[in-house]
Amino acid sequence: MAGYYYRQLDREKRGVYDAMLAGMEALAPGIRVPRLDGPELSDIYLRLKLDTPLLFYVTGFQYRWMPGADHVELLPEYLFDKGKIRQHRQAVAARLDRLARPLQGKSDRDKELAIHAFILENVRYDKLKKPYSHEIIGPLTQGVGVCEGIAKTVKALCDAVQLPCIVALSEAAPERGVKYRHTWNVITVDGQRYHLDATFDNSLQRGTLRYDYFNLDDRHIFRDHETLVLPLPPCTADKGYYYRPLSFTKPEDVENRARQALRKKQPHFVFHWRGGGLNREILTDLLNRCAAAAAERGKCVSCSVNTAQAVVQLDFTDAPAGDPLLVQQPDEGNEL
């Protein structure tokens, strides 16, 4: 099926997109396309790369034309020579097949959970931002990636298990400390579209998988995500949010669930707070209640909080932590 960004183009630009795709898949040194200006060609190329994560070996292009000609010649820039590209394509295809095969026949939700878990359990953020970390070969073959490579990997895995997926792209905002553009995904699960940011969840892990950005609607994702570069379809559903069953409005409910976790000897308890602004006063009250419950069982408690998404992780330990309250900032690699 044609990619989401392809479907937003007019007929002429679709023709350029198709020619780019065919030429790059064939590893052509030059690709002839109808003459458009540079920004238009760059926009089509961006859409192609977001739609097609398997073009991991293409890093950009230049172009040239003759005066008066009705076409231009694109000159793709490849990350490797042809022999290496073919080797990497085979390795990536085999890796995707191994990961996708056990998910065939599973529910949409189970597929999404497995893909999310793969990223969190197998990929670390590459603060050096190597070229391959921006593409799927970083997460799939090296175990490292930046947000772009991670989001493209999520899409490649979703494509492999027939789960509709878009790579979302937002602007940088240097005035707010966001130095780079950011990428994540929009996934259709059981007929409903949701935002999924595996990079942000990956950056929040402290001994347990996190799902702060698992199936958010537009209202919640844009609390800490910037303006989109390319428009996305609306995401208005909230029933798929991972922490929905663990979303509380009363401190006593948090305390009761913390006691359950302690009885079950669980080292961590993560929940969502929707009882008003998650300020220091409320956090202190929640932490004091849970600390008293932990002390009854000879345990200490500390917490880390994602204030933008109002998600709190409680950690139960035998010895007190240095700082009982940690305010987390997701995706530290994206900050100035």
Regions found by a protein language model. Name each.
Residues R109-L113, E148, Y194:
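Short, solvent-exposed positions on alpha-helices
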